Amino acid sequence: MGKNVVVLGTQWGDEGKGKIVDLLTDKAKYVVRYQGGHNAGHTLVIDGEKTVLHLIPSGVLRDNVKCLIGNGVVLCPKALMTEITMLEAKGVPVRERLLISDACPLILPYHNALDVAREVARGNKAIGTTGRGIGPAYEDKVARRGLRVGDLFCAETFAAKLKEIVEYHNFSLVNYYKVEPVNYEEVLADALAVADTIKKMTADISEILDQARIAGESIMFEGAQGTLLDIDHGTYPYVTSSNTTAGGVATGCGVGPRHLDYILGITKAYTTRVGSGPFPTELDDEVGNHLGTVGHEFGATTGRERRCGWFDAVAMHRAIQVNSVTGFCLTKLDVLDGLETLKICTGYKTEAGDIITVPPTAAEGYDKITPVYEEMPGWTESTVGATSVDVLPENALAYIKRIEEITGIPVDIISTGPDRVETIIKVNPFL
């Protein structure tokens, strides 16, 4: 029998999910995206060649894998075609490997315009969105006025629905945000120009997954962003607009939650965050600079510099709790090479002097807390490219063991570099 494995981020995104998905897909028949949109940035390095994917599942580079985009993903037609063109230029037959739910909400130019206009209007209270229209597209979905992939396939009906929604959003753009309206005719023409191409790749994703399960195939569900950016469980309001947690798998592609066998939580050996929002262990010193420089901490989607800090076991408590994490994949262990002392945040100290080990539920709760650290010795030896725990420095092994002890979750996979071969697999989730 096959296994259904969920790969998701347990921090604020950028944990290295793309590499791990690509690595493990040699055991999977299907790779499924179930939430988010082209705000994701999954970087794959294979034989030294880097590929950055934003929308298409990371398994697309494997010729034995079918890639599915579930209904929980908001889909930008322009971004999809750009990514297809990029991959085809590399010789990847994307259209043979990709299937898309016709229930995916569409991201159209007015969503981008709204996203950018709102961030500008917020000023120094900006959330730090990618400006790619993700949030406004999810808003339209919840308000039941959004257009979906399936709407593209009837031009007359699509045109009528589009006209109504463009007028609705243009009113806000012009009268409230004082920016230029989007052009209805241009939006219509651009959308219909790719309708036939997209139609050839649409399918009933829920049915495909159910039949695959019955046939005993192995399926991987690829998360985007990270748990602490979840719309419900993250550091609200500094969050994304979808459910990035394991529960999003069931709703985002129509698979029953009872059929999920293993939840692999991807976590860096330290912590990073892009954009605004609470970050208790953030470092503004030489160590923070070391993590950012050695770890190449720049967003794959936006190019923005990531904020860096120590491993936060308190925030991780929430991620483990809401995801039922089975095992960790600890990434970027090699970035810690050369640091004399390492720290793990094991608690937050409140203004009253109490130590809490469960994080606040909203951003405001972080305003008056300070991290409590446990110190450990670092190591001078290189871990870059290690493929066996036997070659890891003693202090690196002690650091990993301490993370396991504090969190209660085993570290089943360790990443020691960007290439898929630079990995230590102690336990393969599919075996």
Curated annotation (Swiss-Prot):
Keywords: Cytoplasm, GTP-binding, Ligase, Magnesium, Metal-binding, Nucleotide-binding, Purine biosynthesis
Tagged with keyword Metal-binding: yes
Class of enzymatic activity (EC top level): ligase
Pathway: Purine metabolism; AMP biosynthesis via de novo pathway; AMP from IMP: step 1/2
Residues that, per the record, bind substrate: 300-306
Example of a GO cellular component annotation carried by this entry: cytoplasm
Catalytic activity: IMP + L-aspartate + GTP = N(6)-(1,2-dicarboxyethyl)-AMP + GDP + phosphate + 2 H(+)
Molecular function per GO: adenylosuccinate synthase activity; GTP binding; magnesium ion binding
Active site (catalytic residues): 14, 42
Subcellular location, record wording: Cytoplasm
Biological processes, Gene Ontology terms: 'de novo' AMP biosynthetic process; IMP metabolic process
Required cofactor names: Mg(2+)
Source organism superkingdom: Bacteria
Annotated Mg(2+) binding sites: 14, 41
Assigned EC number: 6.3.4.4
Family matches, as Pfam families: Adenylsucc_synt
Sites where the protein binds IMP: 14-17, 39-42, 130, 144, 225, 240, 304
Principal localisation: cytoplasm
Cofactor binding summary note: Binds 1 Mg(2+) ion per subunit.
Biological role: Plays an important role in the de novo pathway of purine nucleotide biosynthesis. Catalyzes the first committed step in the biosynthesis of AMP from IMP.
Protein family (similarity comment): Belongs to the adenylosuccinate synthetase family.
Name of the protein in question: Adenylosuccinate synthetase
Natural source organism: Colwellia psychrerythraea (strain 34H / ATCC BAA-681) (Vibrio psychroerythus)
